[in-house]
Amino acid sequence: NSLIALVVFGRATGHRLKEIVKPNTAHDELPRDGAELALTRLDHFRHAKGGSPTAAVRAEMQKTMTRHAAVFRDSALLAEGVSKLAEVNRRMQDISVADRSLIWNTDLIETLELDNMMAQSVVTMASAENRKESRGAHAHEDFPERDDANWMKHTAAWFEGWGGN
């Protein structure tokens, strides 16, 4: 279901963008400090000398998400998942990147990917715990019915990662 939805809505988005984005039209200016933030993040992880290897933290994150955020879940499991994932996320402060080079550095790339996935995982787990209904791929066993009166809405979430951004 999710894959076909991505294909359908991706296609629709592409068609709509073709209508509203005109060739050679200027875009909004990027934030002046955007490059600085990206380079600071890159250097932060490139020079990380903690005791937690990226692969170990990633495996723990995946295990936690698989166990606590699968399609069928209940309130207790989700609450436990939020707590466990917070512990795993704290390990990002102790991450270890052995390769310091800037050329073909798969260790650094995997760490940056983990940082992105960790942010998404934390938000996904917290959002699932917060939603008190079942809808789509979210089957909450304590709330088996869809609740349009309270949950027919979008949820916005912010995540403060390593740099608070």
Where are these regions (language model features)?
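Glycine- and aromatic-enriched mobile tails/lids
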Residues: 1-165
